[in-house]
Amino acid sequence: MSFKVISAEEAASYIHHDDNVGFGGFTAAGTPKVVPAAIAKKAQEEHDAGRPFAIGVFTGASTNDSLDGALSRAKAIKTRTPYQSHKDSRNVINSREMSYYDMHLSHLAQNLRYGFLGKINVAVIEATDVSEDGKIILGTGVGIAPTVCQLADKIIIELNSHNPKELAGFHDIYQPADPPYRREIPVYKPSDRIGKPY
């Protein structure tokens, strides 16, 4: 399987005004860094041309300046959930220029799967590698990456060459069934692995 390699600016061109975008990662670890900055640049260019541009932003947790900071400064976020901790985001939220839903971050993936928060148009995730058959080896933070990759129409993968390739096999990605079908998580001893490494 071959994958198209594009620049961050080209990747940003796949994201449109009013899209809902799910970002992988958990805190700054594993959060995409280059593509969100390119989205912010695109938003600023659209605003300078007199056109609207703002997206819904869904993340696994707080992020980094390249995502929450850059997008907030560019007035590129219409809706944000769950947890965030960036000063620029807080200022935009408090000035009522961004809708914010302070949901507990552990509820987000399930609520997205239920469809409570609308359609995820694009997933943007950071990865260490992508196998020939399309398995995504995530970086140092997973967050909601598995859920948004399942739900999105398009997936943009930001490869982080600073992550060691030895991260392959590090993860144990498991998504429990949604209620009312959820069962216990079958981890009974520290060495149990119940999910997949990709």
PLM feature spans:
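Conserved alpha/beta enzyme-core scaffold
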Residues: M1-Y198
